[in-house]
């Protein structure tokens, strides 16, 4: 009898272990690729500044894609290997979206790597079909392709003698944050990802986002929306973000975001494991100017803590005592503010360019 009870208990516990923590999809079937496929990188020196030098890179990815990318290295060579941050742009932008921050990050001792997502930048098709909207299979496949492209980017970075393969971070904004939740979820080589203004749950996004390409498709054809939800479920980041744990993840979101709605933000946060940090600023999809430096402070502190082991100040108010004087602070602000402002202006222009009605 005890043996039967023991067997029953074992089966019960086994059944419990297959509950919500069990992955809904097999990551290798969705985001797997041939790891021995040659990268065949092509590298061309590009621009240089006083702080950094840029190398144009293309490399082979899955499905015979060649991925255009930029490797940004500090101008002055360093003896130690560098931590590298992969930068992923938002919808409608390209690999130069974070360019205004390249100088500050390379001066802080980081290498950077940025790619064009599928159907963006150098990979943008001439017919300009919207990334999201009436073609859910196309959108799904593009997101999967971009995640694989990012995994191949890590493969490439691990071949570079300047890069520390154990200190690869990630910053993704908006669509780049959604992609990053999947990428970091299926690739353990990514440390401490930062997901900016990202969200999950495609149903919330399609029904409540102010992006016209989703809203109009949902309103004009409810059956089409249901089909889109079925197709896109495999690339819903809520299924993948929990796999980031036990690596830490930072979320930064606006409490009045109507592009990636707050309900969608919280769905992604709730699906993530621990440790995680959630930072809210007061504003929409683009932080208001009053919070720009605070957001940058959070990002900088997170990178320095988890990739360099030396935390810095949390926000712009915390820089004042560290800099030692008001004059030193204003000098720092004069250098930092233009780059920060330029970045968020470009981000805002990209976002609101997609808010206007467009042909589906």
PLM region descriptions:
Residues 255-260, 287:
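Acidic catalytic loop of the alpha/beta-hydrolase fold
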Residues 131-174:
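Gly/Ser-rich "nucleophile elbow"/oxyanion-hole loop immediately N-terminal to the catalytic nucleophile
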Residues 33-78:
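N-terminal cap/lid segment of alpha/beta-hydrolase-fold proteins
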Residues 266-347, 352:
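C-terminal catalytic histidine-bearing segment of alpha/beta-hydrolase fold enzymes
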Residues 244-245, 250-253, 257:
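Short beta-strand/loop motif that positions the catalytic acidic residue
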Residues 177, 181-228, 280, 290:
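Hydrolase active-site cap/lid region
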Residues 91-148, 205-212:
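Cap/lid segment of the alpha/beta-hydrolase catalytic domain
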Residues 62-63, 82, 87-93, 255:
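Active-site glycine-rich loops that stabilize anionic/oxyanionic intermediates
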């Amino acid at each position: 009898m005890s043996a039967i009870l023991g067997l029953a208990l074992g089966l019960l516990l086994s059944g419990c272990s297959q509950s919500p923590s069990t992955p809904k999809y097999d990551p290798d079937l969705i985001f797997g690729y041939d790891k021995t496929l040659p990268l065949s990188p092509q590298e061309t020196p590009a621009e240089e500044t006083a702080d950094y030098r840029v190398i144009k890179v293309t490399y082979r990815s899955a499905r015979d894609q060649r991925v255009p990318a930029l490797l940004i290295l500090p101008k002055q060579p360093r003896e130690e290997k560098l931590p590298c941050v992969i930068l992923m742009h938002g919808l409608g932008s390209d690999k130069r979206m974070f360019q205004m921050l390249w100088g500050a990050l390379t001066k802080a001792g980081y290498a950077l790597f940025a790619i064009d997502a599928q159907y963006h930048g150098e990979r943008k098709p001439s017919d300009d079909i919207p990334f999201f909207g009436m073609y859910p299979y196309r959108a799904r496949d593009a997101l999967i392709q971009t995640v694989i492209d990012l995994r191949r980017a890590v493969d490439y970075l691990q071949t570079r003698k300047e890069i520390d393969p154990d200190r690869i971070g990630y910053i993704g904004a908006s669509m780049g944050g959604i992609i990053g939740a999947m990428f970091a979820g299926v690739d353990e080589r990514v440390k401490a990802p930062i997901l900016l203004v990202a969200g999950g749950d495609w149903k919330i996004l399609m029904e409540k986002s102010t992006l016209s390409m989703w809203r109009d498709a949902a309103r004009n054809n409810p059956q089409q929306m249901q089909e889109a939800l079925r197709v896109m479920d495999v690339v819903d980041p809520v299924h993948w973000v929990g796999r980031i744990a036990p690596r830490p993840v930072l979320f930064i979101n606006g409490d009045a975001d109507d592009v990636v709605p707050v309900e969608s933000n919280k769905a992604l946060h709730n699906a993530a494991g621990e440790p995680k940090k959630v930072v809210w600023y007061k504003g929409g999809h683009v932080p208001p100017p009053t919070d720009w430096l605070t957001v940058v402070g959070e990002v900088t502190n997170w990178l320095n803590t988890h990739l360099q082991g030396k935390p810095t100040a949390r926000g712009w108010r915390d820089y004042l005592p560290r800099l030692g004087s008001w004059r030193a602070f204003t000098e720092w602000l004069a250098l930092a503010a233009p780059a920060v402002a330029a970045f968020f202006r470009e981000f805002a222009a990209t976002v609101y360019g997609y808010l206007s009605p467009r042909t589906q």
